[in-house]
């Protein structure tokens, strides 16, 4: 198997774990009697660790030039720390175990992303063909675990997740390093970070990820509480990822006709609609399906457009740090704030208000894009 195949396999296992863990772990926590607030805290630990951990791991990798070794070691540590879920149901014990898990788990993706782009150096347009297998892995497990949990105890989700983590570790062992050139490792980025468009793009990304906080923490709980089966919950999660894949495939064509600014504005507008539908139209399966298809815009198109903007605004030697910074600001700070806000609102105000708040966050991001992201990207393809 060539490096393309090994990278594709790694993405498959990595996102397969996320597909088994993210949508259903909150249901397990609910089953052991934890409050919505404590569930939100545990589910937001991933975002909390992404505040600073990616910057630390990327610095270590760049200074030592041993990305694969760090990926392997951190995945092994994540596997060991995840095992705490089999040993305790105590909140403090789970808090410590999940904190350690996410500290090490946060190392892998940015380093493998850099590894992939370095491997594809002359053909970055092929990135989607490799990254696509991550979405496939997510679909397989989110549907499979959903059907499994209709007949098996919720605790079985933990074992599935553990074995998928093991698969990720074994896959990481097959990866090989890509040599970096001096030009790829050089270059201060403060001058770029001070630019208005960069500040507004990062801030908008924070609000978009914060808006998704309610979705990632409480979407499954929300649907199960309305009487939907866990297999249907899995299908709805899968629809979102299918929409994401379709958008990834279509983005090069779309961006030849629509500017990056227009794409981002559409993403935030559709995200605003999506979260209102989830909160207020949960009894309509048709509207829920439509809302999940909008994941193609609220995540897929937004992610692709943001990556394209960073690729255009930062030179090659700044890309790794730019990606790590965006991950810390958007997925770290934004994800953490969104999850904690959702946890605070869920029990006190209810599901509809919680998802309305998510919609308001997306609307705030729309305003930031409108005010701060220039419309100068027409004709430059988003890869």
Predicted regions and their residues:
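Symmetry-related core transmembrane helices of the 12-TM Major Facilitator Superfamily/SLC fold
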Residues: 156-173, 353-371
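Helix-loop boundary and gating motifs at the non-cytosolic
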Residues: 1-50, 198-205, 209-236
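Interfacial helix-cap and linker-helix signal at transmembrane-aqueous boundaries
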Residues: 29-30, 60-61, 132, 147-152, ...
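Cytoplasmic helix-loop-helix junction between adjacent transmembrane helices
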Residues: 98-133
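Juxtamembrane intracellular "pre-TM" segments in multi-pass secondary transporters
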Residues: 1, 174-207
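Helix-to-loop junctions at the C-terminal end of transmembrane segments
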Residues: 52-66, 149-150, 246-260, 346
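Structural signature of the two symmetry-related core transmembrane helices
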Residues: 69-83, 162, 262-277
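Hydrophobic core of transmembrane alpha-helices in multi-pass small-molecule transporters
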Residues: 12, 81, 91-109, 206, ...
């Amino acid at each position: 198997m060539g490096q393309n195949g090994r990278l594709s396999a790694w993405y498959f296992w990595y996102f397969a774990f996320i597909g088994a863990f993210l949508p259903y772990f909150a249901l397990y926590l609910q089953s052991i009697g934890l409050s919505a607030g404590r569930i939100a805290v545990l589910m937001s630990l991933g975002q909390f660790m992404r505040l600073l951990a990616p910057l630390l791991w990327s610095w270590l990798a760049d200074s030592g030039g041993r990305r694969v070794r760090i990926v392997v070691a951190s995945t092994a540590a994540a596997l060991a720390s995840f095992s705490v879920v089999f040993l305790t149901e105590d909140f403090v014990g789970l808090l410590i175990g999940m904190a350690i898990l996410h500290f090490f788990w946060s190392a892998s993706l940015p380093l493998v992303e850099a590894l992939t782009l370095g491997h594809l150096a002359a053909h970055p347009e092929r990135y989607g063909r490799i990254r696509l297998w991550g979405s496939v892995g997510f679909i397989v497990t989110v549907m499979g675990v959903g059907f499994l949990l209709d007949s098996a105890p919720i605790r079985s989700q933990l074992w599935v997740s553990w074995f998928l983590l093991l698969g990720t570790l074994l896959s990481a062992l097959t990866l090989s390093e890509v040599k970096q050139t001096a030009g790829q490792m050089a270059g201060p980025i403060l001058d770029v970070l001070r630019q208005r468009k960069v500040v507004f793009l990062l801030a908008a990304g924070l609000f978009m990820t914060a808006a998704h906080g309610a979705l990632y923490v409480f979407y499954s709980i929300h649907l199960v509480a309305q009487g939907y089966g866990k297999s249907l919950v899995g299908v709805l999660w899968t629809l979102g990822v299918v929409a994401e894949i379709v958008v990834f495939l279509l983005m090069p064509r779309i961006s030849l006709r629509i500017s990056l600014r227009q794409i981002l504005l559409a993403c935030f507008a559709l995200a605003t609609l999506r979260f209102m539908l989830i909160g207020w139209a949960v009894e309509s399966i048709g509207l829920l399906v439509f809302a999940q298809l909008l994941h193609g815009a609220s995540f897929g198109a937004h992610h692709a457009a943001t990556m394209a903007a960073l690729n255009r605004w930062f030179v090659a030697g700044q890309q790794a740090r730019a990606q790590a910074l965006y991950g810390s600001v958007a997925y770290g700070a934004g994800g953490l704030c969104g999850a904690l806000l959702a946890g605070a609102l869920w029990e006190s105000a209810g599901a509809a208000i919680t998802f309305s708040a998510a919609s308001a966050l997306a609307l705030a991001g729309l305003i930031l894009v409108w005010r701060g992201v220039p419309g100068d990207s027409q004709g430059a393809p988003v890869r």
